[in-house]
Design a protein with these regions (language model features):
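Structured, contiguous alpha/beta core segments that scaffold functional sites
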Residues: 2-209
Length: 209
């Protein structure tokens, strides 16, 4: 199956390689990170999928659509004030962050993940010279934090399709909220939302009946 976006024909099977490339993904030398607070090094999104509830979805969608109208810009602070930053980065931020979505679609997706999971991850793809090529919001089934012998942090993304990818934590933009008990992740919505969603479903069922 293929689709055309921004004048480029892509095959769904090639999207993973389009984002992460074909490089060596062997990270067997890494070990699980240990946190001082004793929390696990794995984050799994709330299995209740609050976005499946129409009320939660409508609220999130309203916020996401409004924030999707923002115009992101890259600027640099100098001794004489703020000046325009990289032209290529501004094109990525303001026009097409990646081949699969527009700037507004990118923002809407990031905001939706932020409110759904209290953690949104954006993979920063760079070329061999370190120049930013694209920004990809990542859908994931779980995220595991790992560390190497030099104490560099890595994140292993396990995706719904069974594939996984491990990258340096510095290679992602991690936006979080309800950043309280865990040292790295925003708290998941399982306990906070389950009771409210159950009550909301019960009220809807009572109205229908």
């Amino acid at each position: 199956m293929s689709f055309k976006k921004g004048g480029e024909m892509m095959n769904y099977r090639n999207i993973f390689n389009k984002i992460f490339g074909f490089g060596n993904t062997d990270k067997s030398h890494l070990t699980g990170a240990e946190f001082l607070d004793g929390y696990t090094n794995v984050f799994t999104p709330f299995s209740g999928v609050p976005y499946a509830d129409t009320t939660f979805r409508d609220c999130t969608d309203t916020i996401a659509r409004h924030l999707g109208k923002m115009k992101l810009k890259h600027v640099r602070k100098t001794s004489t004030g703020m000046v325009q930053g990289s032209i290529s980065i501004n094109h990525i931020l303001g026009t097409r962050p990646n081949p699969f979505m527009t700037a507004s679609e990118f923002l809407e997706k990031v905001v939706a993940q932020y409110f759904n999971y209290n953690n949104a991850f954006i993979y920063v793809k760079r070329d061999v010279n370190g120049v930013i090529e694209a920004l990809y919001p990542l859908d994931f089934g779980s995220v595991e934090v790992k560390v190497d012998k030099e104490s560099n942090l890595y994140v292993k993304f396990q995706f719904i399709n069974g594939k996984s990818m491990t990258v340096l934590y510095d290679a992602v933009i991690h936006i979080k909220r309800h950043f309280n008990s865990h040292q790295l992740f925003g708290e998941d919505n399982s306990r906070a939302l389950k009771e409210d969603l159950d009550l909301l479903h019960a009220v809807k069922a009572a109205i229908i009946n």
